[in-house]
């Protein structure tokens, strides 16, 4: 694996974490605070 390829993969992982982690935290917080009774 070339250093540039390693840097590219690392940037992809970092970008995914930067996007996914805040969205996951926000969804968990919203689902915890939103106590609407959902009847499916």
Swiss-Prot record:
Lineage: superkingdom: Bacteria
Transmembrane segments: 11-31
GO cellular component: photosystem II; plasma membrane-derived thylakoid membrane
Subcellular location: Cellular thylakoid membrane
Keyword line: Membrane, Photosynthesis, Photosystem II, Thylakoid, Transmembrane, Transmembrane helix
Keyword Transport: no
Signal peptide: none
Entry membrane topology: Single-pass membrane protein
The keyword Transmembrane is assigned to this record: yes
Pfam families for the chain: PsbX (PF06596)
Organism placement in taxonomy: Bacteria, Bacillati, Cyanobacteriota, Cyanophyceae, Synechococcales
Similarity comment: Belongs to the PsbX family. Type 1 subfamily.
GO biological process entries: photosynthesis
Its job: Involved in the binding and/or turnover of quinones at the Q(B) site of photosystem II (PSII). PSII is a light-driven water plastoquinone oxidoreductase, using light energy to abstract electrons from H(2)O, generating a proton gradient subsequently used for ATP formation.
Assembly and binders: PSII is composed of 1 copy each of membrane proteins PsbA, PsbB, PsbC, PsbD, PsbE, PsbF, PsbH, PsbI, PsbJ, PsbK, PsbL, PsbM, PsbT, PsbX, PsbY, PsbZ, Psb30/Ycf12, peripheral proteins PsbO, CyanoQ (PsbQ), PsbU, PsbV and a large number of cofactors. It forms dimeric complexes.
Protein name: Photosystem II reaction center protein X
């Amino acid at each position: 694996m070339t250093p540039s390829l390693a840097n590219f993969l690392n940037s992809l992982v970092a970008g995914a974490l930067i996007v996914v982690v805040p969205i996951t935290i926000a969804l968990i917080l919203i689902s915890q605070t939103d106590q609407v009774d959902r009847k499916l």
